[in-house]
């Protein structure tokens, strides 16, 4: 049997709430809100009390538009309830009181910005003393965004990884509609094999083969320039001796590498050509493919090999300088190793993040080089100096570069007193100029590296957190399905229903309707004595969580 006293108390609370609501509406609606009226704000279970005039200091915000007609207002407790972060709200409320917004040190940056956005405030209103913390939070978010792009192809969840792949290839709509052809299955698989080294064991094997060919190509390119691995090029010619006698002779003009190096280059470039064609055919976007610097390096290096081979075979007296320059491009294939090592990727992202500091460093170096080159040129001419090596300012530029970078080859040195003074100042200024931006670059690298190390140690999969709106919608649907089944199966059919306690979150209005229906069912059970043997007894426990949510645990015992 249901407890009638609990329902009587519930009805009395509802009637008192109606009386308070009518009295509150008369007070706030007819007479207006008094600026000296105190307002109670319950934020995350922590009650804050302030004046209405305090909340009106910052217009066009959530707190400046509080009225008793809002769903957040609880007429029983005469307070506004917000399920938000209470510690952050203390700083926000203090902003209304003092007009100064300070950044809390014990709260994460994105959380603080999210709370400010909810209350209708802007993070730019933060006091200057807290700007460093705000900028540090933004830098952290940018770093994590870069690492997210690096790990975009390493999603552990197969379903999410498949969805990301379909989105990358532009087949998202066909994927959700269930339209998948063989080409749509083959193309991402082949692309993953040759472009994502850590996607599978086969991809790791292909990546290992590619790295092996890169090292073999670079190693042979370096070795073939050594004299021990080169053959002399001999040219036979006839020399006319005095007296008209023609004598044949052999002249050593130059050297060429051993034939084995040509075979090694051919084998390596066959692999590079095959890899380049496959990656081009199966790439998600041809435009992005050509925009990639690594792809352009691979394309130019591969084409340079075939250009060298054609020039050697077609042109009899091939231009050696042009051929050697084209072959030098192949050494840039070392940059392809960045695809296979995260440390190199972090280094590249560090240089990108430090681009402003690097540009500033180059600018100051150029400025100092020009100034000290001109100074040392005129300083060496002020005194008699027969060993003057600074015959022009352009020659002084080379000396200034070597001095400011603390290299000091020693091929050019000042010999006069003023020249040595200029050289000393040049060396000191070079040390200061180079040393100042270095900590910023090191800090960026340490930030990228530490975040990447922490990301590798953290679990990839996290617990899924549902939004509150989705939970409330599911609760309403569950309550709508549960009520007819309980009334039909328990009262009408006479069948015993056994259920476990099911705590659900529903809206306050749904709670009122549910209790009202139970109350009517109790009256029908008391009036009908013939159905006691087949009826069920329901006990409902109502636990108040807030003004807009109530947890109901329903237990039906046979």
Curated annotation (Swiss-Prot):
The chain crosses the membrane at residues 203-223, 258-278, 292-312, 358-378, 390-410, 422-442. The keyword Chloroplast does not apply. It is found in: Membrane. Its main location: membrane. Residues 516-546 are annotated as: Disordered. Disruption phenotype: Egg-laying defects; retain many more eggs in utero, laid eggs appear later in development. Moderately defective in generating the expulsion step of defecation. Hyperpolarizing shifts in the voltage dependence of channel activation. Keywords: Ion channel, Ion transport, Membrane, Potassium, Potassium channel, Potassium transport, Transmembrane, Transmembrane helix, Transport, Voltage-gated channel. GO terms for cellular component: axon terminus; dendrite membrane; neuronal cell body membrane; postsynaptic membrane; presynaptic membrane; voltage-gated potassium channel complex. It is a multi-pass membrane protein. Disulfide bonds: none annotated. The keyword Protein biosynthesis does not apply. GO terms for molecular function: delayed rectifier potassium channel activity; voltage-gated monoatomic ion channel activity. It comes from the Eukaryota. Residues 529-539 have a biased composition (Polar residues). Changing residue 408 to E: In sa630; Premature egg laying with fewer eggs retained. Expressed in muscles for egg-laying, anal depressor and sphincter, and the four most anterior head muscles. Found in neurons including enteric motor neurons AVL and DVB and the sensory neuron PHB, the spermatheca, and the distal tip cells of the somatic gonad. One of its GO terms (biological process) is monoatomic ion transmembrane transport. Changing residue 439 to S: Channels open at more negative voltages than wild-type. Changing residue 142 to K: Channels open at more negative voltages than wild-type and single mutants. Belongs to the potassium channel family. C (Shaw) (TC 1.A.1.2) subfamily. Shaw sub-subfamily. Voltage-dependent potassium channel involved in the excitation of muscles operating egg-laying and defecation. This is Potassium voltage-gated channel protein egl-36.
């Amino acid at each position: 049997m249901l407890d009638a006293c609990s329902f009587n108390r519930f009805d009395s609370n509802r009637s008192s709430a109606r009386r308070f609501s009518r009295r509150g509406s008369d007070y706030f609606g007819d007479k207006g809100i008094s600026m000296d009226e105190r307002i109670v704000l319950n934020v995350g279970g922590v009650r804050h009390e302030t004046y209405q005039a305090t909340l009106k200091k910052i217009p066009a915000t959530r707190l400046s538009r509080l009225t008793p007609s809002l769903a957040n207002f609880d007429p029983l407790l005469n307070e506004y309830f917000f399920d938000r972060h209470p510690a952050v709200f203390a700083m926000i409320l203090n902003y209304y009181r003092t007009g100064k917004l300070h950044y809390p040190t014990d709260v994460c940056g994105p959380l603080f910005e999210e709370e400010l956005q909810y209350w209708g405030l802007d993070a730019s209103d933060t006091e200057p003393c807290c700007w460093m913390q705000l900028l540090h939070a933004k830098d952290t978010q940018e770093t994590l965004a870069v690492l997210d792009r690096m790990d975009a192809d390493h999603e552990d969840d197969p379903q999410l990884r498949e969805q990301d792949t379909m989105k990358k290839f532009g087949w998202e709509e066909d994927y959700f509609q269930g339209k998948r052809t063989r080409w749509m299955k083959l193309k991402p698989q082949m692309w993953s094999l040759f472009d994502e080294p850590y996607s599978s064991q086969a991809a790791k094997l292909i990546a290992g083969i590619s790295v092996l060919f890169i090292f073999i190509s670079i190693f042979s390119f370096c070795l073939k320039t050594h004299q021990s691995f080169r053959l002399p090029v001999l040219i036979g010619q006839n020399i006319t001796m005095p007296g008209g006698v023609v004598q044949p002779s052999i002249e050593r003009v130059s050297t060429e590498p051993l034939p084995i190096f040509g075979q090694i280059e051919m084998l390596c470039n066959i692999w590079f050509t095959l890899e380049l064609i496959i990656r081009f055919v199966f790439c998600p976007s041809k435009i992005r493919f050509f925009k990639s610097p690594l792809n352009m390096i691979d394309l130019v290096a591969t084409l340079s090999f075939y250009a060298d081979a054609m020039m050697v075979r077609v042109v009899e007296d091939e231009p050696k300088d042009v051929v050697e320059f084209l072959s030098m491009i192949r050494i840039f294939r070392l940059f392809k190793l960045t695809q296979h090592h995260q440390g190199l990727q972090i280094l590249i992202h560090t240089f990108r993040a430090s681009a402003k500091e690097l540009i500033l460093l180059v600018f100051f170096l150029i400025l100092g080089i020009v100034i000290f080159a001109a100074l040392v040129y005129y300083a060496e001419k002020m005194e008699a100096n027969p060993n003057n090596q600074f015959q022009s300012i352009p020659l002084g530029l080379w000396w200034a570069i070597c001095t400011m970078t603390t290299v000091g080859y020693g091929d050019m040195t000042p010999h006069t007193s003023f020249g040595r003074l200029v050289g000393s100042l040049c060396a000191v200024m070079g040390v200061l100029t180079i040393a100042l931006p270095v900590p910023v670059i090191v800090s960026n690298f340490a930030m990228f590296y530490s975040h990447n190390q922490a990301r590798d140690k953290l679990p990839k999969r996290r617990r899924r957190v549902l939004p509150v709106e989705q939970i409330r919608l599911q609760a309403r649907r569950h309550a709508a399905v549960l009520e007819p089944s309980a009334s039909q199966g328990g009262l009408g059919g006479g069948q015993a229903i056994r259920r476990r306690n099911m705590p659900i979150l529903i809206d306050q209005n749904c709670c009122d309707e549910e209790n009202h229906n139970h109350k009517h069912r109790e009256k029908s059970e008391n009036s009908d004595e013939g159905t006691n043997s087949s009826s069920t007894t329901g006990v409902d426990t109502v636990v108040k969580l807030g003004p807009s949510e109530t947890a109901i645990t329903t237990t039906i015992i046979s």
